[in-house]
Regions:
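A contiguous loop/helix-start segment that scaffolds small-molecule binding in enzyme catalytic cores
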Residues: 184-210, 220, 318, 425-427, ...
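Class I SAM-dependent methyltransferase SAM-binding "motif I" and its flanking Rossmann-like core
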Residues: 509-579
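Conserved anion/nucleotide-ligand pocket segment
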Residues: 126, 130-194, 566-613
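Class I S-adenosyl-L-methionine
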Residues: 2, 7-26, 32-77, 82-86, ...
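Glycine-biased, low-complexity coil/linker segments
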Residues: 349, 361, 376-377
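C-terminal edge-of-domain segments
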Residues: 212-229, 235-236, 333-343, 387-416, ...
Length: 668
């Protein structure tokens, strides 16, 4: 499945005319959506596998399909759509995303459920596919802020109680909002616009601070808000709490659920902050536990008695040790669950190192128990685990009258949240840098990403395409490896990460490096998911600015010897010159590399005539573009740098009225 649009599945698109159907068909193919058309359109529309016909009135048809889709795309007048859907609307937490396109494909309108349903995001995904204008009217979007009611969604946070409408209104007015964040990623804080209304933490003694008009709690604790207070509040709950459970065989789901609720209530912990359940491996088939995890969509991690016994706990039990081979189950499992969360680099699926994981109510086929350290490592592991994790609630015993079984519960706090999301890597080629030279698929992928990572120059060139709430990380030109590592880290966390390269990402770009790094990490080829979006390469861009120099066999050679020995580069230059290829030279010269181009020209002069045509193109399609047509013997007189591509023609290449032309048939 195409990774773009997965979160909206299933998606429906509705057309009422042949024109609308033809507009929607390629969109449906890209997003794997179902296209619904009326009966009379069958004769004029090429029916594909994802096209369905409705025979009733559209009003009645909508009643039937409304509950079945998470997003519905209409190509219809917006007023007509409003009248059609108004009887079906419940609230923003249950309604599907509703997006409207005009039949000309000029505008994409986020009509309903912009935040919770994702209509705003879907609008930004669709607009580049049509080269259309996205129409989003929400206040947070216009302020370039993430919607407060979807702020934690990329990180898997759970939305808690509070007056969300009032707080959203205060943010829309630009009034000061206090943010008290006790847990979870602070990435979002680092990527806010310069002018934002948030004030973080409490003021220091003697420090002047604005009076907040609202407050946002980001915490694993459960705050009780009085509705009478003048200061409206909301709360997000990062999933950082690991619940260790030990139980008798046959303990019921009801007892487990009631016990966890009671313990959390007693200690003022938020049930929504639960990351997962952890226990001993002999409980991997415990029906009550499995049913509870499935109902709550929580991962279940199991550990061997040997590993659990390595954990220093406050309440060890010799009785438990005699029964299952470890002095602690609940406390040790909670600590290990939390420790594993911060040590696994957030990898969803855990490389087959955990027991069945419930993802969206389904059991992932993952039968391996958590990987054990080697025997010689156990004592060192025990030393590390002593201080590794904060045990918030020590072992509590719980029974429930009328229910079979008994359980012990402990709760540990992980440093980093469990997102519950499968991360994605979108490797994007942005083309030469001018936005209209970027493919619509690449623009769509960029819009879909939670995070964008790239060289600072390339990031600046595509800045107009970024959306509010996106995390954008710039890095220097020499930090390609760090960019790749950072992207993989964030994707393993569960985020959708776009890694941008100029030109084509698979030609001297980041795609190869990222895939190399994934291979080195024993990537399973599935998690994180990877999709590559090609772009117009630098040699294509340069060629288009000077004519048609690549009409016969050609090759590309980089003169950078940072990763390739010069001896290898020299052999390739000789071979290309001897074979009379048209040659595109990348990375011809830098501040520290000045001799390579001189040597390359010398090699070509041994096999080509001095008057052999050469094009020198710097920053094609950018504001500071420079183009020079010259001859091989004059090439060293032209200023070049790392943003330059040099095109050396073959013996048949010529210059005609300042156009460089290589004949289709070889004449040399």
């Amino acid at each position: 499945m195409n990774v773009i649009g997965q979160e909206f599945q299933p998606i429906a698109a509705i057309a009422t005319t042949p024109t609308a159907a033809k507009l929607l068909q390629p969109i449906c193919q890209t997003l794997e959506a179902t296209l619904w058309i009326p009966n009379f359109c069958q004769k004029t529309v090429n029916l594909s596998l994802n096209t369905q016909v409705y025979t009733d009135s559209l009003k009645n048809h909508l009643v039937n399909i409304w509950p079945d889709y998470n997003a519905i795309i209409f190509s219809l007048a917006s007023g007509a759509v409003v009248r059609l859907i108004s009887p079906l609307l419940q609230d923003k937490y249950h309604d599907p995303a509703v997006v409207v396109l005009d039949e000309a494909g000029k505008f994409v309108i986020s009509l309903c459920s912009g935040h919770q349903g994702g209509a705003d995001k879907l609008t930004n995904i669709l607009a580049p596919l049509l080269n259309a204008t996205p129409v989003i009217t929400g206040a947070s979007h216009n302020l370039e802020l993430p919607g407060i009611d979807i702020l934690g969604k990329p990180f898997g946070w759970q939305r808690g109680e509070g007056d969300w409408n009032k707080v959203s209104g205060i943010i829309a007015r630009g009034e000061t909002v206090q943010v008290l964040q006790e847990a979870g990623s602070i990435l979002w804080q680092k990527h806010l616009p310069h002018q934002h209304p948030f004030y973080f933490g409490f003021p220091k003694i003697g420090e002047a601070s604005p009076t907040p008009k609202a407050r946002i709690w980001i915490s694993f604790t459960q705050h009780q808000f009085s509705p009478d207070l003048d200061l409206p509040k909301v709360q997000w709950h990062p999933r950082v709490l690991w619940v260790g459970v030990g139980c008798e065989r046959g303990t019921s789901k009801k007892l487990i659920a009631t016990g966890i609720d009671k313990i959390f209530s007693t200690h003022h912990l938020a049930v929504r902050a639960i990351a997962g359940i952890a226990t001993i491996n002999i409980k991997a088939d415990e029906i009550g536990l499995l049913e509870f995890c499935q109902e709550k969509e929580l991962p279940l991690r199991t550990f061997s008695a040997e590993l659990l016994n390595c954990v220093e706990v406050p309440n060890p039990s010799n009785i438990v040790a005699a029964e299952v081979g470890t002095t602690s189950v609940a406390e040790a499992a909670a600590i290990l669950g939390a420790k594993q969360q911060q040590d696994i680099n957030f990898q969803q699926g855990y490389n087959n190192n955990s027991s069945p994981i419930f993802e969206q109510g389904e059991i992932r086929d993952n039968k391996q128990e958590s990987k054990l350290p080697l025997q010689g490592e156990l004592q060192e592991e025990k030393k590390q685990l002593k201080f590794s994790t904060n045990l918030l609630v020590s072992k509590q015993i719980f029974r429930l009258e009328g229910e079979p079984g008994a359980m012990t519960i402990a709760v540990a706090l992980a440093e980093k949240e469990y997102t519950g999301r499968t991360g994605k890597l979108l490797l994007i080629g942005t083309g030469p840098g001018q936005l209209d030279q970027m493919t619509s698929a690449a623009k769509t992928a960029l819009s879909y990403a939670d995070v964008v990572i790239g060289y600072s120059l390339y990031i600046d060139l595509i800045k107009p395409l970024f959306n509010p709430g996106q995390i954008v990380e710039k890095m220097p030109i020499t930090q390609e490896r760090q960019r790749g590592e950072r992207a993989i880290e964030l994707a393993n966390f569960g985020l959708t990460v776009a890694v941008v390269s100029s030109g084509d990402c698979g030609i001297y770009g980041m795609a190869g490096l990222v895939l190399e790094q994934l291979r080195a990490s024993c990537w399973d080829g599935k998690i994180p998911a990877v999709e590559i979006f090609p772009g117009i390469s630098a040699l294509q861009s340069a060629a288009s600015r000077v004519g048609a120099p690549l009409m016969h066999d050609f090759c590309a050679i980089s003169l950078s010897d940072l990763l390739t020995p010069w001896e290898v580069i020299e052999k390739r230059l000789i071979a290309a010159a001897m074979a009379d290829f048209v040659v595109a030279i990348y990375n011809p010269k830098s501040q520290n590399r000045t001799e390579q181009l001189i040597k390359a020209v010398k090699i070509f002069l041994e096999y080509r005539q001095p008057e052999n045509p050469v094009a020198v193109v710097r920053s094609a399609y950018r504001e500071n573009e420079e183009i020079t047509l010259t001859n091989l013997d004059k090439l060293l007189e032209v200023s070049v740098d790392m943003l330059t591509v040099i095109l050396i023609g073959n013996q048949s290449t010529g210059i005609y009225n300042n156009w460089m032309i290589t004949p289709r048939g070889y004449l040399g």
